[in-house]
Amino acid sequence: MQKKSSEEKFWDWFSDYSQKISAVEDLSDARLHKLLDPLSKYLHDYCEGLVFEIGYDKETRTFELVISADGNKALFPAVERLVYAASPVRQWKITAFRQPKGRNYTIEYNGYHFDSDKVFFIPINNADNSVPIDIEVVYPDYKEENRNTFLGGTFLLLDALLGEKCTELDLAYINVSKQPDTVGDCKYYSLSMLKSYLDSRKKQID
């Protein structure tokens, strides 16, 4: 008998265990958090560094398990191998990587409000229309002492706008700074336009 792969072993376990999670339809239920601890352990046993998110669609009564590399590009192959090997699980949708949440997105992070329509980026060294690109994300209220907050909020916005994989593969360098009073020949775009900006560059490459 052929030995099962680590991916198959994971899905064999999850196929049975998922029924316990499916019985709790309220994602805020304290019982659910306790049920997710074994899932975290089994996922880390498969590949340390992988994380997951759970979603639930009340209309279709379907759960979603998102397997994520948490932005670590080196772990992308492990995510893809695991999700590709997934067998159908009743009431569950299995997804690789955090997906885009739409063109417009707002978050509150460490006391700051981040709105993709009101945050702007400047492409850096973009003359050759290649991908990945470097971007400078600028804020009128940027303060250097709060740099980590601005960086954290920026990455959360990018993850929501582009999805995990696109953020890592299509953006080579990301910096945050104060928006200058005059921009000269620089072109500003709102972060809400970033995905379409990247898509247009990819079409030029093709």
Predicted feature locations:
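Long, contiguous binding/interaction regions
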Residues: 1-62, 71-206
